Amino acid sequence: MEYGFKAAGLVFVVLLLQQAPVLIRATDADPLQDFCVADLNSEVTVNGHACKPASAAGDEFLFSSKIATGGDVNANPNGSNVTELDVAEWPGVNTLGVSMNRVDFAPGGTNPPHVHPRATEVGIVLRGELLVGIIGTLDTGNRYYSKVVRAGETFVIPRGLMHFQFNVGKTEATMVVSFNSQNPGIVFVPLTLFGSNPPIPTPVLVKALRVDAGVVELLKSKFTGGY
């Protein structure tokens, strides 16, 4: 009987180890062909986009100039502009597990506290100086890490951690960031709490934030139009 229990235990451990690669996978799935240019008009989506026929994909899918110039940093109250280059904007990165953003900041502009649930982020400041802040999980006591990053310097944001960038300089600033996902996703914390559709019930936020209903309603009014 003892031998039987030991054998059963060994089988369980082997099966568990076989699943380990699945459990620890933290990036997009590996590609199974040289390229798979996304067909953004296809109605077929299986955790990604269907491929265009190879004959319909010219070499232009390898190149993009969309982040060569930035947008209007004064177009929103944040004082920043994000030029996205994910699979929706650059179909050539479909299945390749990469994407990029360019972010331009007015003096005092911010990329508000947010999370990328599906990707690690690495970035370089091209001009100006940015305060980069990262907030750890409850495991670290919600520790706050920060540093002023200047032109030519780099930073990394672990996957899923809340973070922000803030232009502490007197001139405009620009950074370029890359992700290990074709679609890293983004969750803006203020917009998520106060601009969700439909809205989060006010009593929930009153209890969670420990403020009165008037404060919650005021904050909701600030995000009715999104960012």
Curated annotation (Swiss-Prot):
Stretch forming the signal peptide: 1-29
Keywords of the record: Apoplast, Disulfide bond, Glycoprotein, Manganese, Metal-binding, Secreted, Signal
Function statement: May play a role in plant defense. Probably has no oxalate oxidase activity even if the active site is conserved.
One annotated Gene Ontology cellular component of this protein: apoplast
GO molecular function: manganese ion binding
This protein's record includes keyword Transmembrane: no
Quaternary state and interactors: Oligomer (believed to be a pentamer but probably hexamer).
Disulfide bonds: C36-C51
Entry coiled-coil feature ranges: none
Family the entry assigns: Belongs to the germin family.
Localisation per UniProt entry: Secreted, Extracellular space, Apoplast
Binding residues for Mn(2+): H114, H116, E121, H163
Main subcellular localisation: secreted
Pfam family, one: Cupin_1
SUPFAM superfamilies from the UniProt entry: RmlC-like cupins (SSF51182)
Domain Cupin type-1: 65-217
Glycan attachment points: N78, N81
PANTHER family, A to Z: GERMIN-LIKE PROTEIN SUBFAMILY 3 MEMBER 3
Protein name stated in the entry: Germin-like protein 3-5
UniProt xrefs under InterPro entries: Cupin_1 (IPR006045), Germin (IPR001929), Germin_Mn-BS (IPR019780), RmlC-like_jellyroll (IPR014710), RmlC_Cupin_sf (IPR011051)
